[in-house]
């Protein structure tokens, strides 16, 4: 085996720290040299001292590590910005694990993966500093300007190009949109080069909005008329304050049924549940799909709602990775697809105003791949919600309100994948970015458990601010509810309800994150087999578990309840009692004079025991705002002329949403990503 120098060893060791390999294990690999094994025999490795590293989990995580010459002697983890009941609880265990492993080779803590990954990354930074080296893929230097979110297009040295690939279409990013694009091109006979900076196709969760089609026909939900579909499109335009393009929404709405049938075709083993809560056979537990809100709550009529949530959605369970990977495999099986995983596209190639290819860096070798794409390039690179500079520029309120990002996908260098690099690539090539971006921050209720499900979701029970005052019509969907919470003191409030909640839930709207079904189960084991309790369904055991965990407060009297939720503020306690009394009067009168909440969702809070759970700001799931586009997935220059050969799909496709994420169609972002990936593939190959 070839020996490596001590300098080389240290560099490799620091890089390995990022991926969890111990320094002593690396030293053992350098056999034949007494000095090379000194890591396990006491040779100095570190510069003694205390070092600090930071990384982003739910919020900023700080790790401070103290080193002797040969060991990590102390670890301090500051997870105060994490969810207290999740990341905060995990911190002591993570400290012990780092000390025991003497590296970042530690197991993830179930339910606290985001915090664990952040701690590992911050700890790796400490190790790098102590060893006096730096590895690629770290955070951008703090000294760079926050305004410099676009950066400068790199110059690629042709001498570093180790491989040249000639194809019809290059696809950048293998999420839902990119995978759909690959399959679309390949099945039409085009040659595809697929670039992805992670180690394979990427996806999260599994909700899709689907209008009509064979899949929806399985549940009799394929009966949407032209007029109803156009009403859905109108609602979307209103929610986006008419800052998006109707043509994009319309083409999707009228064609998604057939496209979704094509998508699930790739997964012939997919099991179709009869209802939202049907039992699932053991052999199908890892690959099934449910209709969301089927059957609908008995009192829900979307036609009568001020904020309708249309019964169009389905969800892949436990998530959609089986279907996404099946689609990618179906594309590869055509023989027309080359995949380049772990490769970072750094520059588009433009000739006479047309996009004709790209340069990508292979993370494994540091060398470049030049891809000539005769028909064009499809950008499907996702959003930018882990890029603080871009957030500050495009959605400053996300930063101002201290909204934390929920995103766990990482590239092969250990960094989050959603960095907005597609926007940078496109803008360097002359494309324009849309205005009025839409952060997805729909509230799912207070007192969330490890799965992110709130105690009663965002169901419209009474809500009081930190002074004990009522401040809104509580009959709001998650996004609008979040907007109201952000306006309150400390951006917090209390949801309050009484023991009659089981009778009241069926009157709540079937909407994003809201509890609207009651189930009388004593434990999850009593529920449908292999179909864990869905977020819109609530049973008494769940509420009592929330009380036991401290995620909800319970009291026999209202006086006791307000004393618990406002423990050091007697003025707030009295104001809260007055607010509840006023609310009860309005409920009994049948008309909400204060906030015009529908009488059908106003109930007096008067039968103990009483409950409360705290609302804080929700998490940012994705920040939707991309390059200006249209229903053919084109991009546009500063004069709004089409840029030939440059297409977009997924979150990088602009003008789908604007201002804020709409709540009328659960899973519409996934659905439009898949559909327009399909469209982009066909259009690129045909040069449309």
Residue locations for each model-derived region?
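N-terminal secretory signal peptides and thylakoid transit peptides that target proteins
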Residues: 1-20, 24-27
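Active-site- and interface-proximal helix/loop "cap" or "latch" segments in soluble metabolic
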Residues: 41-141
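N-terminal Rossmann-like FAD-binding beta1-loop-alpha1 element of flavoenzymes
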Residues: 169-193
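Conserved N-terminal glycine-rich FAD pyrophosphate-binding loop of Rossmann-like flavoproteins
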Residues: 198-221
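Conserved redox-cofactor binding core of oxidoreductases
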Residues: 252-367, 388-389, 586-607
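Glycine-rich loop(s) and the adjacent beta-strand/alpha-helix scaffold that form part
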Residues: 364-367, 371-446, 664-666, 670-679
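An anion/pyrophosphate-binding glycine-rich loop and adjacent beta-alpha core
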Residues: 423, 429-564
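A glycine-rich dinucleotide-binding beta-alpha-beta segment and adjacent secondary-structure elements
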Residues: 571-660
